Amino acid sequence: MNRLTFIKKASLISTISLISGAHSLSNFPKYKIGLQLFSVRDAMEKDPISTLKSLKKMGYQDFETYGYDTKRKKYYGFSPIEFKTILNDLGLTTSSGHYGLNGLMELSDYKLFKYLDSCINASLALGDKYIVYPMLNKKYHSYDGYKLLVKKLNQMGEKIKKSGLNFAYHNFGYDFNLYDRKMGLEWIIEETNPDWVKLQVDFYWVMRANKIMPKDLIDLAQGRFKLWHIKDMDKITKDYTELGYGSIDYSKVLPNPNISGLEYYYLEQGGNYKIDSMDSAKKSIDFFKKKIQKLI
């Protein structure tokens, strides 16, 4: 082989390698596969380390926590630093957490911020990016209740933002009911500071409420729906079910993640397991990887 032929072949191989590499990168998932740990709360209570190991084998990489004990300063029986070390050793991460902020609506600012400080410190120790307001208690499902809520969300959001973290509100079905001619979530979108208060869309509750489609909801606050909860709805009872076993066709309803502003998503199933919570987590991620992941 003469030198010119060698150079041409080497150039061709290099070009093919570059194209192949670019193709591989374009097919590489942008987001880690996340799970809201409430889905496997029974297993986490019994043996959190073994549970995390099993979830990793299934393919889960990132988690959203729940149930931080502010009095004992513990996640699943571990201090934030201990839990972070466990995650690091397993090659896993957390990016968000649901905290008991919904019980603080009528606390004084001092007590509210004291509680919030504990959540912030724990979240920072884990290396999280988001603190999430999980739900609005039933007694506040009214126009006056949402007026108080947006005030509290702004207060909490401003403080959390100053800490270097982000704050988000998680929707339920009642957030799509009308309160003085507007949906509850519309009041939140319009009356909270978008720099302080982001949004976590729970697609199950959007579809169950049946008041607005996910893509139209995202259009109400483009770029602000930073977190997603992905789960399915039983075709008959409308209860939770494993992904792929229910009525939600994500190929038709899933919004554009770029328009949403998506940063993290989490699979979730709050109950109604076909066998048990870990089996359901496996069924859901298997279906997700086959049918939904490519849409995100």
Question: Which residues are covered by each model-predicted region?
Answer:
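Active-site acidic/histidine proton-transfer and metal-coordination neighborhood
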Residues: 10-12, 16, 22, 105-198
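A cross-domain feature marking catalytic cores of carbohydrate-active enzymes
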Residues: 35-39, 65-67, 96-101, 133-135, ...
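Acidic-and-aromatic substrate-binding clefts and catalytic sites of carbohydrate-active enzymes
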Residues: 40-46, 66-79, 102-113, 138-147, ...
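Alpha-helical scaffolding within the catalytic cores
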Residues: 47-50, 77-83, 114-119, 182-186, ...
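Structured C-terminal subdomain patch of bacterial secreted/periplasmic proteins
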Residues: 266-273, 281-283
